[in-house]
Structure formats: C-alpha cells, structure tokens
Amino acid sequence: MLRRVAVAAVFATGRKLRCEAGRDVTAVGRIEARGLCEESAKPFPTLTMPGRNKAKSTCSCPDLQPNGQDLGESGRVARLGADESEEEGRSLSNVGDPEIIKSPSDPKQYRYIKLQNGLQALLISDLSNVEGKTGNATDEEEEEEEEEEEGEEEEEEEEDDDDDDDEDSGAEIQDDDEEGFDDEEEFDDDEHDDDDLDNEENELEELEERVEARKKTTEKQSAAALCVGVGSFADPDDLPGLAHFLEHMVFMGSLKYPDENGFDAFLKKHGGSDNASTDCERTVFQFDVQRKYFKEALDRWAQFFIHPLMIRDAIDREVEAVDSEYQLARPSDANRKEMLFGSLARPGHPMGKFFWGNAETLKHEPKKNNIDTHARLREFWMRYYSAHYMTLVVQSKETLDTLEKWVTEIFSQIPNNGLPKPNFSHLTDPFDTPAFNKLYRVVPIRKIHALTITWALPPQQQHYRVKPLHYISWLVGHEGKGSILSYLRKKCWALALFGGNGETGFEQNSTYSVFSISITLTDEGYEHFYEVAHTVFQYLKMLQKLGPEKRVFEEIQKIEDNEFHYQEQTDPVEYVENMCENMQLYPRQDFLTGDQLLFEYKPEVIAEALNQLVPQKANLVLLSGANEGRCDLKEKWFGTQYSIEDIENSWTELWKSNFDLNSDLHLPAENKYIATDFTLKAFDCPETEYPAKIVNTPQGCLWYKKDNKFKIPKAYIRFHLISPLIQKSAANVVLFDIFVNILTHNLAEPAYEADVAQLEYKLVAGEHGLIIRVKGFNHKLPLLFQLIIDYLTEFSSTPAVFTMITEQLKKTYFNILIKPETLAKDVRLLILEYSRWSMIDKYRALMDGLSLESLLNFVKDFKSQLFVEGLVQGNVTSTESMDFLRYVVDKLNFVPLEREMPVQFQVVELPSGHHLCKVRALNKGDANSEVTVYYQSGTRSLREYTLMELLVMHMEEPCFDFLRTKQTLGYHVYPTCRNTSGILGFSVTVGTQATKYNSETVDKKIEEFLSSFEEKIENLTEDAFNTQVTALIKLKECEDTHLGEEVDRNWNEVVTQQYLFDRLAHEIEALKSFSKSDLVSWFKAHRGPGSKMLSVHVVGYGKYELEEDGAPVCEDPNSREGMQLIYLPPSPLLAESTTPITDIRAFTATLSLFPYHKIVK
C-alpha cells in the first residue's frame, strides 16, 4: 500500500491503511502554513501512515541524558545469556547502551546489538512506568505468563480479528455521526489536511482513532519493526513494481507457518495489527501485539525474512491487490504530480521508474515476454532481503536481556548473502536537464489552483546535524508579518503555503534532495501566478543577501529543545517504525535524535543550500482546471494531462537580472510565545480519577482534571460553542463553514508565532457548534486562547476575503464529492440521519450565492445565544481553568439557550428487508466504486454495543481473507461497527473497480461472506471465543501513551454529552459476561427475517458498469454544475431481492424516527 509521506514513492500491503486520522505528520524541515484547503498547497501532499509522525524538533540539547551505564562494549555481538548470580542478573538485566542519547523525559531503556549475520537491532525495554521509575517483572510473574502461554491451545482455524485502526481491512470502531467529509479523513494524500473544512464529524472521527482501547494502569502493546535497506530503486527494468509486490508476497505464508493468512490471523486473535511499506531505498515492516504473545509473533513475522513461501497460486491473486491499490491511487493529484516529476529525471535514473506496479507490469507483460514472475520474486528476495541490509527495533515490557535473547534466537536465522548493498549515490544531479527549468501546466482531478516551485539539490542527509533545509523551510513557511504567505494573503492571491523537504525517499535519497514551495492560489492568484513566483524569489533573494541569521537558528533551537526535552511518549508501533528507519540513516548515538535535533550552527552549510534556490534552477508546476484544452501531453502511468512551456521571456530576463527586493518581505520578529516556565503546578482542589464538573451555569459548564500521571508542563483546552442556528438550513451550514474558515484566515498571521512555538490550535466547524482546541506548554497557552476568543468576538471580513474563501469552499465541496468513498458516506448518512444536510445540499446553497451581509448577520446571531461546554486537562489549576470559561462568557456576552439542545441527529428506522441505493460516481474519469452493506440494529445498550464490537473483531480477518485475498474484489475491505447518532449497526465495505467488477456482484459476495461467517462463529470453540474476548479486553486496558490520548477519550464524552468517563471499565465488565451463544444469537437476529439491510453503491466508470446497463432512473432535479445524484436501477442480480431507493428524501419522508438515544447504560 502506498505509504505517502510528502512525496515519497512508497507502498504498503494494505493491512493497516487507516490514514491515521488525527495523527499529524509533520516532516522535519517542513513548516506547514494553515488555511482553507491547504492540502492542495503541499509540495507533495501528505498521507499519514503509521509511524511517520516525525517531530519537528530541533535543538542543541545540552542536557540530554545518556541511557544506562557503560558496559565497555561498543557495537558488541549479541550474547545469549549471562552467568551472573540471580541478584546480579536482576540488577544488570536492563542496563542500557550509554552511547544512545535520549530525552530526559524518556523512561525507556535502549540497547544496540549486532547479530553474527550482520543484522543490527535496537532493543527497547518499556518496563518503566510513567513516573520514570524502572521496575522489572518478577520471576514469578514471568513464569506465570509462560505457563499460561504453554497451556493455551493455539487453534489457527479459529482465529478471528480485532478492531484495530484498519480502513482497508480493519474493523473500524467509529461513530457515524462522527464521520466527516473533510479532506483530511480520506485515503489519498491529496486530502490530508488539518484545517480545511473541519467539522464535528471529523473532530470526533479523529478522537475515535484513539479513544477505543485505551485505559491507564495497564500495559502497552509490544511492537517490532524491520527496515530492509532496499526499495523500489532496485526494481528491474522489465518488472516495474517488483519491490512493492514482494513486500505484499512475503505475508503469504512461510515454510514454518504455511497458512496464507496465518500471521494476520494470529495478530487479530491477540489484539494486534501489522503493516508494511515500500520507499525508494527502504522497505519497512511493522506489527504490534499483546505482550504475552510477542515472542511467538516475532518468530512468525521473522519467517518473512527467513523462508517465505511465495507460492505460485498466490501470485495472480495478490497482483490484483497491487493493481487495486494502483487504481485507487490514479485519481490522486499528488500521485499524478509525483509520477510526472519522476519522469523529468535523466534517462537511466531510477526516479523514472514506475514504483507502484500493476496487473499490466506484473502479470500481463511478463506472460507476454515469457518472464517467470515467481522465479524473479524469489531471486529479488534472495538478492535484497539480506540480514546485513536490515535494521530491527523491538519494544516491549521485558528486560533488555530477555529481548536480546529472543532477537538473537529468532533473527540470527535470516540469511546473509554477503553481497554489497545496492548503491545509487553516483547517480547525482538527476534533474540537471533542459526539461527541468520549465513551466509545466497540469490538469488536476480536483478543482484547484496551485503553484509548486521545486529545486533539486545535492543529497542533504550528511548535513543532518545542521539541517539547512529545515532552517530555510522554517522561514519560507512562516506566516507572520513579513512572510511570503502574509503578503500573498493580503493581495488575496493565496490561501496556503508549504515549503520544505519531508526527508522521505522521494524527497531525500542518496542521489538528490528536493526543496519545494507549494502555494494554494485563489482565482485571482492563478491569474497572477508569475507575480506569485516572483514574490517567492524576492523572499529567497532577501534571505541570500542577509545570509544565515544566528538569532533565527537559535530561536528554532529553543522551541525544539523545549519540545524534545518534554516530549510525550508515542504509540509503540509508530515509534519502532520510525526508529528502524533512523538506524539506516544515523550513527548509534543519534538513533533517537537524528531526525529531530539541530546540533550545530554552520552558516556556510545553510548558505550553500540557500544559494542554490534561484529562479534559473527552479521547476514550476501550475495545477488548474483552466489548463484543460491546452495540455497536449499525457503521462504514461496515471494519464495526467500536461504541457511543457518555456517560462515567459520577460520573467526569465527579470530573474536573470539583479531584481529589486520587496520591502514588505522581512525576517520574523522575536517570538513572544516561547515557553520559559516549566514548573509543575500543585493541586488546588481534590484529585479525581476522571474529569469533574467545576462550573455549571445556564451559559455553560466546565469539566476539569489536573494531570498527575504524565507530569509534563503542558495543557489541553477544548471548548464547544453550541448553537441551534447552524442546522436550520443548508445555507446556514455553509455560512458557518465560511465563518470558521474566515476566522482561521484572520488568525493565521497573529497566531502563527504561537503555532511554531509548539502551541497548537484548531477551529472546527461542528455539526452543532464551533469547536476550539488548544494545546501545548501551559506557560503561554492562555495568550493563544485569549487571542482566538478576541478574534471571534471582533469577527469581521472584507468583501475580497469573503469572495476568496467562498470560491475556495466551492472547490473544496466539489473535491469531496468526486471521491467515491466520501460520496458513499454522504449518501448513507443522508438516508439514515433525519434533517441532515448533505454535501450536495451545501454545494447547491453555495452555488446559489451567499452575501457578505448574510454572513455577518449569521455570525451576529450565532454569537448572541450559545451554550458553552469546555474541558481543561493537564498542568493547570482549577482556578486557571475557570478563567478560560469566564473569558469566553465575558467577551462574547451571549444569552443562554432557551432549552437544552441535543448534539446529535435523529435517525430513521429502516423498514425490514434489503434496500439498495445505487448512484453514479461524480468523477467520470474514476473507475473506483464503493460498496457498503449496512445492517441496522436500533437503540441499544452499552452491553450490546460492546457485543457488536466483539462481533466485528471476530469478523475482520475472515472478511479480509475471503473478500480480498481469495476473491480479490478490491484493496479496501473492512467490517465496521457503526454508531450513527446513538443508533447501532454494522457494515461491510469493499472498494472495487468498475473495470473489474459490477457493484452488485460485490454486494452478493459480501452476502456470501456473511453467510459463511455465520457458520464460522457457530463452529467456534469456547477456547477460541474466550481468546478473542481476552484480546478485546486487553485492547481496552491498553494504557495511554501520552496525555493527549486521555484527553481525547474524555473530550469524546463531553462533546457528545454522554459523560461516561469510565466507559472502558463498563465495556470490560460487559465483555467478561459474554458467552459464545450471545454472539451467535445477536448475529443471527440481525441477519434473519425482519433484518434491516441497506446497500449503498457508488458506481465508477468501467466495462462492468456500462451506461446501457445502468441508465439513470432518476436525476436529482436541482443540479449545479453537474453536482447531482444520478440514481441507477438494480441489475437482474439484485432486482428481485432488493427495494431500490431512487429518491432519498421521498424514501425517508415515509419512515419513523428513533428517539434521541445515547449509549450510556
């Protein structure tokens, strides 16, 4: 599956493609300017994948703490045991490596070893508790666990799945009313965006990513990651995509564990997950699992690299998974731009290769040319999956000696072929060609105007201690006074800007490093794109003339020093993935710090990079729908339409000259938001286990909890400003979106200093109110919060800004609607949630025209009558917390709501039977279809919700195995536990292609799977059932890795007004009471006579969905620019067994409504 971090050409198996909503990937060296639809501005837009959460930290860190004691062994070969006495062994068994530098706030212990076969490993003992005290498991505890393991029957045929974060194959435990249509939640990297069109659905959807399966005082998951120092650059010319394909194939059984889906099944049975990804020069595999099963999981996983089967029978089926991944990627503008950029490399450079692979390159062409793909796979594995290219990281609550023993026993079996690692460093200057310094006009899939300016520099990895590109990007991406973006925003030419290098394989490898600046343009900005480029060049020239500034460098150091010193712990599986890649790039002492810290100020190194950023070496790419009709070229693999033009002569001549600087552009002033007080505050009220309501008035209430667990000088402030005004009409919902986006725009410049000082804020246009989220070092956090409330109180907009934002919002709505997965979600929720305004409703309201006057009247009315609900947690006293609510109430001076307002929709009760809503996808160039089969349950208890979670957990692995592995229906295949505004249900979703399957064939296959699953759970043994229950209990007991996870869980209760802060404890108690018969009975009841079943099909364009077979039966009459639902009739496959829905409003108007319901009992 494509691991997309910035522009990295990377892939992953799809076993854990959840795009990790809410995990903010900020690569080192990239400063991200916030604003409307900013995903389009990214140099190479980002898709967040597990473990790519690289901190933006940079510091000199004079007080970094070495880890452990000096053993007197540097780079030692792993030892199998020790002869110390029992007492000595216990004291020395967790001694860390003194050369590895770590943060003072990191309680973990580290040890580096190198096996006899050349594999390098980093062992991480996570025995420490959050106070930083280390405690070893007793011998009795370890023996007891071992006895339990030995006594447990491992019945592979009974193994079932957990509810991890998977989107393509994972059980997705998320609330439907918490599902968003915002770009950041989607599968392709075009839309990873924290601030564009945020709404409450996304706010809660982000929370659900982390809310499930977290509880304090219990142990974390164990995790491991292995990086092979070879990637797609090594693809043979006659088999494009082979490295990516091999990454898929090694999962398909091994000599020791031959079951094709055996590893996934084992993990799902024991609460784990796995993933893999392929980059240009690296391939990464990672998994996590309950600690009790970590050693066995390591042994099973290691067989990928010891003796994978890669049987011939599996090849054709897995090629289809790779091809589906490619088809899903084709409508992504980021992927298209990347392939186009790679094609500019000089002939013979690996950047010109097709890294993805598809059915054509891996199946049809090889057969035509008599190439044995199976034999070539094995050759590739033998040549490149060699131990001495590998770096391994394992993390668990075991002693370092225990981990060393396991790693040595298991991973020493990986073969070492003794051959030198592939080296591409001689292929420098791949873009030093006449074709590079040109203007490329590109026709995008989405509605967007964007300008990307790119330079290809010599490789910068060797300068990691200075990080010159990070220094430059910090200035280029600044949004304060004197910045590029501040100037362009004042001209109403740009909405967002991103500049830098993400340090991924595509942006930085052994042959070059990229520095890119991407700018989201307004309509007017598109007309002046040369002037926009000139502004960028003027700013860079100013930096070049000034030279590196030590003040700026030291400010970045101070900011990042604070963040590193007080860093919060991350999820183990993310952490080990990041570390195994770091081991490929940095010396031992910098494994933990190399990607985060600035160690040395060397102005000559910064100047060398900065002086190369000149117009004569720049590549310009202009994305716009306005380019259609003038682009006569087509890129081979993604079909991107583009043209190549010389840069206009007048601009070329100007940029060759000593052009004038712009007096409006200058360096940022000193930052007043940098924290200097890190004192941990004393309690001023009794300590509580859960948030307590400390203020309750007609105008609002406040929940508060002082942190006494993580003990870091940070705080989280969240407020929900609730108003009944928003949902009164589609126009109001749109006005609210405009309001929040203009408010964000207005705050961009004054709040940016706080943002770069690690004080983060986010404004969310919720379904029922404005959500304000602020977090960071508590010292200066009140300043930022007050700034936001001040700007909210004094809200204003110029006509130019109003026009700019509304035009961009039209593009944003359009871009959401043309994606099958988001349209499918919109259609499903439009059917289920009464009085919901669909995205098409909002698009039409916007196209009908709204005025600035109507916006200002709406905002005035919105602010006049509210109910404010807040949560404050962290290093803050109760008195200080009450001041936050008081500031909101005093500044806004609103009256209370007349009556209590529900923060959820009412849901329609589906009739019995099978209903089908089949609509056309809105992008005629997209073959992708989305099929969801949903079963409605109704108003259920917390016990039944938990039972449904258990059901979906059981369902996940066999669903993946049947629908993806065996039937090869698509890449994204997953069952989901649905909580739609308090009404329960479950669904199975498959993303497929109209070039391969009819959507109704897929629907029938889903039904076939569910029938077989019923038989499977009926035959489930009690032991297998109990093992799955235990796995889910362990997930729910999994401790929070940092304060933010605890806050997310509590905020989810506040923002949904459920307030069941000990929900996990209740769910665990419910799980302990379940029997196998409960599960079977519940499933049969929802699948038997009287079941309420809804199928939603969004149908792509391809030979299996021909127009003549699906002529529209009804078109929504209120069309705007073709944005309408086109309903299709069922084909003979489903015509007799389903009732078609050909008008959603007419269908739901006849249905009863469930009462408002909360799952709290």
UniProtKB/Swiss-Prot annotation:
GO cellular component: dendrite; mitochondrial matrix
Top-level taxon of the source organism: Eukaryota
Name of the featured protein: Nardilysin
Residues the record lists as binding Zn(2+): H244, H248, E325
Keyword entries, A-Z: Cell projection, Hydrolase, Metal-binding, Metalloprotease, Mitochondrion, Phosphoprotein, Protease, Signal, Zinc
Cofactor(s) of this protein: Zn(2+)
Pfam families: Peptidase_M16, Peptidase_M16_C, Peptidase_M16_M
Signal peptide (residue range): 1-18
Tissue and organ expression note: Testis, and in a lower level in brain, heart and adrenal glands.
Subcellular location, record wording: Mitochondrion; Cell projection, Dendrite
UniProt-listed Gene3D superfamilies: Metalloenzyme, LuxS/M16 peptidase-like
Keyword Zinc: yes
Residues with Phosphoserine modification: S85, S91, S93
Entry annotation: catalytic residues: E247
GO function term, MF aspect, one: peptidase activity
Record-listed E.C. numbers: 3.4.24.61
Sequence similarity: Belongs to the peptidase M16 family.
Keyword set includes Hydrolase: yes
Catalytic activity: Hydrolysis of polypeptides, preferably at -Xaa-|-Arg-Lys-, and less commonly at -Arg-|-Arg-Xaa-, in which Xaa is not Arg or Lys
Organism of provenance: Rattus norvegicus (Rat)
Phylogenetic classification of the source organism: Eukaryota, Metazoa, Chordata, Craniata, Vertebrata
Residue numbers spanned by region Disordered: 42-105, 130-218
Subunit structure: Interacts with BACE1 and NRG1.
Record's compositionally biased regions (Acidic residues): 138-209
GO biological process: negative regulation of cold-induced thermogenesis; positive regulation of axonogenesis; positive regulation of membrane protein ectodomain proteolysis; positive regulation of myelination; proteolysis
